[in-house]
Amino acid sequence: MHLSKNNKNIKYFYLLILIFISSVNNYNFQIFKNNLFKVSKINISGVENKLKNEINLNLESFKNKNIFFLDKKIISEELKKFNYIEHYSIFKKYPSELYIDLKLTKLIGTTFKNNKKFYVGSNKKFISSTKFKEKSNLPNIFGDFEIIELINFFDLLEENNFNLKDIKQIYFFESKRWDIILKNDLLIKFPSSNLDNSIKIAKNIIDSDLELKKVIDLRVSNQVIIRDE
């Protein structure tokens, strides 16, 4: 993040102070000098208190570091350890405070791995469900999938005007194909190939005046099967 002109001026002002007090040998001045530019407070915004406390604890080692020589890249590496963070910005407020603004990743579904519940983040990471309050409005996702496969599938659905909030359950199969169950209990079976076209067909059927059945089966090439169960 680039420093504004005003902030650069402030930095130069404090540097001049640092140069001045560095030349003073008085004992009290030495104590003052040693403490003036140490990080005394780290302010975190953008997350709830539970996560804020966790992050603050991990950033504790940056306190009492000289703010001029504290490299933001080192702070960035520490923030990257938290897989629920999507974006962040770091700002030094001289003489002794850090401001860190965080943006959480968007949660797009829930799944289970090794019998433990995880949220799926739009940042392509699995996030322990213990990090957040229960999210009941997310689709449950079953199967051994890679997150990038899920993200690509969601992108295709959104490109074809599917409302992801209407999806209740998602199933991924070893054959690399998807089934979805909507909140109205409509099951849509997609093929493993030509997925984009199949999604278009499914959306057209849903948007048509035809009375919807229970199943739209698109697994067989050039066939559309609509049935009651």
Indicate where each model-derived feature is located.
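Charged, solvent-exposed interaction patches on well-folded alpha/beta domains
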Residues: 1-229
